[in-house]
Amino acid sequence: MTSFALNPRLEGDSVFVTDLPLSSVRLMKDANYPWLLLVPRKSDLVEIIDLDDNDQVQLMREISLASTALRNATECEKLNVGALGNQVSQLHVHVIARFRDDSAWPGPVWGVVPPKDYEPDHADRLIGDLRDALADVQ
């Protein structure tokens, strides 16, 4: 197995938030929807079933923790969670905060409107809140 490397598209479309025991947590560069990616730091993964049993359990725990942190930070009305991988095959899980008044509601977020940059102070505050919420995860 080769060493872990983050897919260049995932790296370019997101910013680092923190590392959990298994996954790197990243914030998508799209203020239309507060949106996290969890990327397990293991090489050659495409599907959740490519993880061993213990790592599958850990990933689910991290999805739950990231979902809770995002919901608390944004006070969203709904969370969308999924591992699609149609554009980027490297295993990554989307955790998206949704609001009834967002531009894509109630449909999926992909391709509805162009990505919108965060105001720097808003992104910094959100990342700080998420880091604080995820700081003590083992």
Where are the model-predicted features located?
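HIT superfamily nucleotide-processing domains
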Residues: 1-138
